[in-house]
Amino acid sequence: SEGVGCIDEWIQVDGRRTNFPRSGLFLEVLRRIRAHNSATYGIPNPGNAFCGTETIEPAAAASIFEDLVAPSVKRGSLRIERNLRPTEVLAEGDSIRGVRFSGSTDQTPSLTVRAPITIDASDWGDVIRLSGARYSAGPDLHSRYNEPSAPKQFDETGEQEMNPVSWCVVLREANGNDDVIPRPPSYHALSFAALDRIAPWVASDMSGGIYSPSGNSPYTHRRLVDRWHNALQPGTEATFLNYPTQDYPLCQLPLRVRNGLEQASPGSSKQNIVHLPHHLKEIILADAKSHALGMLHHLQTAVHQRTGDFPQSFRHMRLTDEFGTPDRLPPKPYIREGLRLEALDVLTENDLRAKTKEPRWAARMPTDSILAFQFNIDFHPTRRKYLTEDPDGPWQFIHTASRGWHTDTDRATFPLAGLIPVARPGLLGAGHTVGATPAWLQPP
């Protein structure tokens, strides 16, 4: 649903990045991905992408996940409801007893679900927020957990700073035809000047391994199907854009966005996006979508004019129709950070951040561990700077000194108590919404 079809997971071994060991449900899904690609293209890994060896196209991914849960649906142990949003949490005293949903479309009726346990694995933690459970959003100050990368005090961005969202763009070759999208209203060429200094496409089959520098370009970064190097049929080439230039910081918002928020709800432009109801989040996310389309437009026009015509030009790529959306974009953006549950146990940066380039066992290994992990602490650019005096004008992203791609975790485990709120029996967190601090919790 986010269009993220290149699985970016790695670990460093002998100075080179390689896939981390696969197991469990993750391995099962990868086997299904490889089986689909082998049946469709004759090879299990057709993408030759810079960021990962495993790639899958949107419609195929949806089918794989549907097939994965189909036996449970058939047995009646799982029921799937779609196009619903939580609007009310039902409680008896402090205990959570259910959730009331409203339809996100006119055709979807409302629904009330009563259950002894409610698990919130949503992007923004909607049920946790509505339940009254304690949670955090945005940065924690250094004084709270004594984390080295935490700010000592808030500046003008306050608590709004988050890992940015990205509206991904999935593209297929248009068989040599031009398929240039209209110029988005918010487009400014200067916002995408970083693309004017690099090659939009490189002729690499990534035989040097993932993250080989010679294979990096916006096109090959997360390519889904490489028909040129794999000698596949014309029309099969596919890629998707999830490049830092399209990242959309959630603080220092453009004036048009702040005005839209204030007109809808005074004071909301200064709040963290997590705290906002759905209709206010949509004001911000609509501008994030426009920014992503601006990047594609820039690649199809300004970058094409600079490089000249060639078969892999973005000018000859069209938006996929696999999502079934009017604008042919994924129905939701790639959301890297939501709220953080105030849980019985909160894992901090001091518990697991690697002190060397050779990760070892984490400083704290919880005795109630439910899963093991090790990953790169992946902050995309969290802030923006405006390039003119116009607060609606062109802007570019900023990486801060303490939030970037430069840190890793040791070999760590996550505690069961990190899913349990300090007060709200019957409620559990999952996914983004667990007991962790923003200094390290950046789920892929």
Q: Locations of the language-model features?
A:
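Short secondary-structure boundary/hinge segments and terminal tails
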Residues: L90-A91, N146
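Short amphipathic alpha-helical face segments that pack within enzyme cores
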Residues: A60-I64, G294, P444
